[in-house]
Each structure stands twice: as C-alpha cells, then as structure tokens.
From Swiss-Prot:
Residues engaged in binding Zn(2+): 62, 64, 210, 298
Binding site for substrate: 91, 143, 183, 213, 298
Record's protein name: 5-methylthioadenosine/S-adenosylhomocysteine deaminase
Keywords: Hydrolase, Metal-binding, Zinc
Keyword Lyase: no
GO molecular function, a single term: S-adenosylhomocysteine deaminase activity
One Pfam family hit: Amidohydro_1
Annotated InterPro entries: Amidohydro-rel, Deaminase_MtaD/DadD, Metal-dep_hydrolase_composite, Metal_Hydrolase, MTA/SAH_deaminase
CC cofactor: Zn(2+)
Lineage: Bacteria, Bacillati, Bacillota, Clostridia, Thermoanaerobacterales
Gene: mtaD
UniProt keyword Mitochondrion, yes or no: no
The species this protein was found in: Caldanaerobacter subterraneus subsp. tengcongensis (strain DSM 15242 / JCM 11007 / NBRC 100824 / MB4)
Length: 433
C-alpha cells in the first residue's frame, strides 16, 4: 500500500526545526519521499495534514505491559514493599491469558498517546509477542529473569529466553526483537548473570536490566560486593553487549564514566521515580557526557499510565528545578530521548527514531487545533510542554494506519476493556481467571 501524508507540519527529529506544508510519501513500510507533491505518483491512501504535526512515533524504552492489570492497586508504598508485599504475590497467580489481555490494554493506551515502539520486560512473553503482532506496533521483548534456589528452574528460564528468541526475533514483519532480561543485579547472582551474558552473546542480542533504581539497592551492593551495581555489572562483563539499563537513578561520577565508556543506554523514568520516591536520575550529567539517555514510563502499575508525552514534559521540567538551570534538558533534548535515543538504545536507529527517506514509516500526527496549542508560536516547545497524549490523531506503524481520527483499527477495544476488568478483579480476589 502506498500512502501520502499531505500538507503537514513536519518535525523529522533530524534537526531542531519544524517544516511547514510538507508531503510525506510512504511505499509499503518505507518512507520514499519528503517534500513537494509528486503529481505522477499514485497513492492508495491520502491523509490530510492541515492543522496537524507529523513526528516520529514515540519510543517507550522501559515498561512492563502486563502490569496494567495491577494499575491503581497498590499505591503510596516504597518500591521494596510495593514489590514484595503487593506485586510479586499477585504476579505468582498470573496466567498467560492474563498477560495477553493486560499487554493488549497497554498497547491500546500507548497507541492512543502516540507510542509506536516499546521495550518490555515481563512474563509469558509469547503472549506479549502475539498481542504485538495482532495490534500492529513495534516492540522489544524480554522474559524477566529472577534467580531462584532451584538450579533446574534457573536453567529453564534461560531456555525459555532462547526459545522466545528463536520463535519471535525478527517476526511480525520485523516489528519484534528479543533481548535477554535479567531483572536486576540484586535478583540475579554473579554466576547466573554470567550465564545470562553468555546466552546474550550466543544469540547476538542485547540485555535489558534494572540498574541502581534505589539507594537501598546501591547500599546492599556495596555491602555485598564492595561495588556499586554499575561497577559490579561492568566487572561481570554485562556491558560487553548492548545494554538497556532501566532507571540509573543513584549513580556515582565513576558510574557515569562507566556508562559512557561501555556505551550503555540508561532509561530515564521520571514519573515512576517520583511516585516510588526512588530519587532523581542525574540526567543532565549523563547528557553532558554524551551518554545515550532514552525515556520510559516504567510499568502502568508504578506510573500509573503509559503516556510518553507526560514523560517528555517531566524530563524537560524536573531537571530545570533540580539543577536550578532553565537551560537543563531543553524541549528538543527531551523529545530526542523519546525518539532518536530510544531507537539507538533498542538497536533500531537505522529503521526508526526519525522521519527520513529510507526509514520505516512509524509516524504520528498531532492535532494542533486544540485550545492549549494556540497560538502556534513554537511547536517544538508545544510538544514538550503543552501537548497531551489525547492530541494524537493518527498513528502509522510500518506504513500501516493503525489509528485514524482516534479510532484504533486493529483490535476490538471494548472487548479488551471487558477482559481486563474481569481478570484484574479475579487476581485481586485470588480467583482463577
């Protein structure tokens, strides 16, 4: 199918500039031309871009999609208690079907707010892959690995990851990637982490892991290993493969140098870090070192939504107050975290993250005819400080229109709402879905 987005304002993310009255031609899944109208080119679908802004689809570089089932269940609790007293007991009762429906709900929410690519770590990842294939977005999936006492169980978890990779990596028209997902250095011991690293190297893929999210985690690492989590992971060799390091809140200057040296991509999750009182990641320091900082929501149970425009807004505002510097994390930098840097972190920078000829057509259209977006003085600032997720009008992934005029075309949204409500209540009551 050939598609034309006609007469649109375009922020390609290649430069800090919005172009007016641009035409974007898509052939199949690929952007073929950006610029003037081509009168001799036939297209199947024309999308009118008047009063809209086109930009790359947003990239949520760290989340736990199936946790939408636990949204608004346990709040105002520190991270360790939140996990051990509330979340992990519920997760022990999850079924594959629960995760399928919960993930599908999260994908619906992401589409509605302009996210076209995610990086997810959870359980029953085959179901997440099926939901991704069905709804039409792009995703990096990792089976969350937590070490247990039983060596056989630990071995099975590695085998599960290998099977997931063999079954789904590169599938769904290339929209799915598989990484290896050790939960954290405090839930996986050194020997097990080395086995996980060996698996990632053998598969030729990256690692997605939580790192230095809380002070407690860092203190326990220093007590147990005499090293920070970052230094511990470096010494184990984890950073020898491409690493998506979620959170990176409590870092020393030496840790930041390690992240730079090893080309690790930290993922900043401002709302989750605020809600769980985890602290403030040293984003400005990392950016000044040239580190590739991506942006994420974390899970919908610890945020409690998946609205990446909200994360962009927080990324561009929190750091100004934290550093007492109005120039800290300017609007375009915050937008880069959610597009260009996210693509680089997920090893997809050649395909997505910008709108340019030859890249995949992952494009969102923002409706600019909203009261909070008038007057149109500076659209880049508007995207960081004024746009709401609900302003997203159209979503295109891999050249296919999966939402138009805020109608999702690929799944029965009401059916998903019904299934999630039923399953969430059953889980909380301790019943089997």
């Amino acid at each position: 199918m050939n598609l034309l987005i006609k007469n649109v304002n375009l922020l390609s993310m290649e430069e800090d500039k919005v172009l007016e009255g641009v035409n974007v031609y898509v052939e199949g899944d690929t952007i073929k031309h950006i610029g003037e109208l081509l009168p001799d080119v036939k297209v199947d679908v024309v999308i009118e871009g008047k009063d809209k802004l086109a930009m790359p689809g947003l990239i949520n570089a760290h989340t736990h999609l199936g946790m939408s089932l636990f949204r608004n269940y346990a709040n105002d609790v520190p991270l360790f208690d939140w996990l051990t007293k509330y979340i992990w007991p519920l997760e022990a009762r999850l079924t594959a079907e629960d995760v399928y429906w919960g993930s599908l709900l999260s994908m619906i929410e992401m589409i509605y707010s302009g996210t076209t690519t995610y990086c997810d770590m959870y359980f029953f990842m085959e179901e997440v892959a099926k939901a991704t294939e069905e709804i039409g977005i792009r995703g990096v999936i990792s089976r969350g690995i937590i070490e247990e006492q039983d060596a056989k169980v630990n071995e099975e978890k590695l085998k599960d990851t290998e099977n997931l990779y063999n079954a789904w990596n590169g599938k769904a028209e290339g929209r799915i990637k598989v990484m290896v997902g050790p939960h954290a250095p405090y839930t996986c011991g050194p020997t097990y982490l080395k086995e996980i690293l060996d698996l990632a190297k053998r598969l030729g893929t990256g690692i997605h892991i939580h790192v230095s999210e809380t002070k407690r985690e860092v203190e326990e690492s220093l007590e147990k290993y005499g090293k920070t989590p970052v230094q511990h992971l470096k010494d184990l060799g984890i950073f020898e493969v491409p690493t998506v390091a979620a959170h990176c809140v409590h870092l020393t200057d030496e840790d930041i140098e390690v992240l730079k040296e090893m080309k690790v991509s930290p993922v900043y999750n401002p709302t989750s870090n605020l809600k769980l009182a985890s602290g403030f990641a040293p984003v400005e320091k990392m950016l000044k070192k040239g580190i590739n900082v991506a942006l994420g929501t974390d899970g919908p149970a610890s945020n409690n939504n998946l609205n990446m425009f909200e994360e962009i807004h927080f990324a561009a505002t929190i750091n100004k107050a934290l550093n007492e510097d109005a120039l800290s994390v300017p609007a375009f930098e915050a937008l880069k975290m959610a597009t260009v840097s996210g693509a680089r972190a997920l090893l997809w920078e050649r395909e997505i993250g910008t709108i340019e000829v030859g890249k995949k057509a992952d494009v969102i259209l923002i409706d600019l005819n909203k009261p909070h977006l008038h007057p149109k003085n500076d659209l880049i600032s508007a995207l960081a400080y004024s746009v709401q997720g609900s302003d997203v009008d159209t979503v295109i992934v891999n050249g296919k229109v999966i939402m138009e005029k805020r109608e999702i075309k690929t799944v029965d949204v009401e059916r998903v709402y019904y299934e999630v409500e039923k399953r969430a209540q059953n889980l909380i009551r301790g019943e089997i879905s």
